[in-house]
Design a protein with these regions (language model features):
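Phosphopantetheine-dependent thiolation modules in NRPS/PKS and related acyl-activating systems
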Residues: 2-40, 46-52, 56-88
Length: 88
């Protein structure tokens, strides 16, 4: 996404889901309520790899203390949108 483009929750969520799909060897159902560890079986290294890809895609840095607020896919999209828009 271009930094100047208009982002919505739905567009951020869509990108996060696509990036999750790239990290999973087999197709997995991803919803807003999906938890990274329990539902999607990400370990800590997998989460950090995903975070790096998210940061690269959106050209944003996610502070480590934000990760505790990003337990589900929906929470991640919400926090990302706030970081990108500078509303947090």
């Amino acid at each position: 996404m271009s930094p100047g483009g208009e982002l919505s929750y739905a567009s951020v969520l869509s990108v996060v889901v696509a990036l999750i799909d790239e990290h999973k060897p087999e197709p997995v159902e991803v919803t807003e309520a999906s938890e990274f560890k329990s539902d999607l079986n990400f370990d800590s290294i997998g989460i950090m790899d995903l975070v790096a890809d998210i940061e690269d895609h959106f050209e944003v840095t996610i502070p480590l203390n934000e990760l505790s607020r990003m337990q589900t896919v929906g929470q991640t999209a919400t926090r990302l949108l706030a970081l990108i828009q500078g509303t947090d």
